[in-house]
Amino acid sequence: MASISTTTWLYRGQVCTDSGKSSNCIVQRRVKCGFPLKTLHAGITSRDRSLRHCIKCKKEDGDGDVSEGSKKSEEGFEYVTVERHPYHSYMDSTSGKLEPASGARASIPGEDYWPEGTSSRVRAARAPQPAGESSSFPSYGKNPGSRRKKNRKATEENVTVETNDEVSDSEDSSEEEENDSSDGFVTYKNEFEREEEETGFELDKKLGRPHPFIDPTKKKQIEKTLTSDESWWNWRKPEKEQWSRWQRRRPDVETVFLKAMAETGQVKLYGEEPTLTETSLYRARRHLFKEERLQAERERLAKEGPMAFYSEWVKAWKRDTSREAVQKHFEETGEDENTQLIEMFSHQTDREYRIMMGTDIRIKRDPLAMRMREDQIKQIWGGDPVYPTINYIQDPNAVMDFRGPDFHEPTPNMLSYLKENGKVISREMHEALLTKEKTEQLEVPDMDDAMAQAVDIGENDDDEDDADVEKDDEKVPRNWSVLKETPELRTAKPKPKKEGRMSLDEAVDDAENLTDFLMDFEEETDP
């Protein structure tokens, strides 16, 4: 390093001293030391003029800037100022390692990609330290508005700020900043009063503290459960409006649980069936409701004791399970409470154990689900799981429709709904309609001469047989096989013969049963 007599510099892998050759060494830095330094002469060669930019790390006073500016013009160096980051690395909570705060490996995105609210928090964290001294301890939000401009006057009288006469420029600039900041704000008269009013529920809601869902001062208590006809939304029932009847959810996990909670008294419903609004509110808070039930179970276990608490799941245990009986049994036989519990659980069936413990002993069972009735269980888990016939998986994010007054009505039965609208009739009505219908009369047209001549197999060549055939079958019907089975249709009126040329469709209709006639005729003529 440097001694007092001579100064040694290590620059770009070369050692330079003031006594040695200094033509290959360029120094652009001020060194502040506690001992005097000799003047260092730096020579510049033509090779050094084409060097890269020098980076200026910190500003000096104004005189230094002027001299450096002249140096820039003389020596041809361009100074580039780089704003340094407030910190070089930080502890990333995701990876648990030190991450760089800037550069290609930095995991902090730009401000454009920050989530909502991050910019304001960063801006608040970068706020300068207040100049004055606090005369009291912080209230942590208990008296809001205490730091406003109206209340600042009282604290400013007690604060004495020591200023230094030497730094006059910084004083002027700070005064100008204070004036600018005071001029930039507008204070309304009722702002302080509004801040004072925000206490309790409003303040908790604003600051994000835990608060009830509805303001306790404005919440109306439910006196009694109303029927569906007495509810306020049922004031007018449309006669033929069918869409609202389908707004009721089918009984699934949420509706059945909510109705069971209303039966146990944990919540109160406005009607007989839970509405869509009540179901969505329960879905958002079902974890809190379960925690309430588990807390009630823990309190009951501490109050009654484990013997009385767990005897609910051992039906075969008929002894007294009160605390007095357990203590008396301990005094008589010397068996403590754990031994009596083991004795009681030895009488527990497999089904009772599965209901009490569930599939995983680490997961606390829901007391409401453990004590559900059989009909409630069938409403949730009934039917075929492969092809569900009772309960279907419903969309939890379905958009609710509150247009009608009776959206809370239960879903109607599909068959009765179709019967009401005349879309479906019963089997008895169908058979009655069939008996009333007349038998359809089939019209038998005359056979054309050309068609009769075309049907000739050639087996009967005798003239006598031909004459008999002409007498018997003077009028050959079109659907011969049908007339053979139902001879009463032969008396029907013949179809009027069309004159003139026939279209293609009419010709096809006229000859549709020709093949049937030929096949039937062939069966009769077989030997």
Curated annotation (Swiss-Prot):
Result of knocking out the encoding gene: Seedling lethal without exogenous carbon sources. Decrease of total chlorophyll content as well as a decrease in the chlorophyll a:b ratio. Absence of grana thylakoids. Altered expression profiles of plastid genes. Disturbed expression of many PIF target genes, associated with the accumulation of PIF1 and PIF3 failing to be degraded in the light, and leading to long hypocotyls. Impaired in phytochrome (both PHYA and PHYB) responses, especially to red and far-red light, such as hypocotyl growth inhibition, proteolysis of phytochrome A and phytochrome-interacting transcription factors.
Biased composition (Acidic residues): 163-181, 458-471, 506-527
GO MF annotation terms: transcription regulator activator activity
Keyword Cytoplasm on entry: no
Main location (coarse class): plastid
Stretches the record annotates as PHYA-interacting region 2 (PIR2): 252-352
Function: Involved in plastid gene expression. Acidic transcriptional coactivator necessary for the transactivation of many PIFs target genes (class B genes), particularly during the regulation of hypocotyl growth. Plays dual opposite roles in regulating hypocotyl growth, preventing it in red and far-red conditions, but promoting it otherwise. Required in the nucleus for the initiation of photomorphogenesis mediated by phytochromes (PHYs) (e.g.
Identification of the protein by name: Protein PLASTID TRANSCRIPTIONALLY ACTIVE 12, chloroplastic
Species of the source: Arabidopsis thaliana
Lineage start: Eukaryota, Viridiplantae, Streptophyta, Embryophyta, Tracheophyta
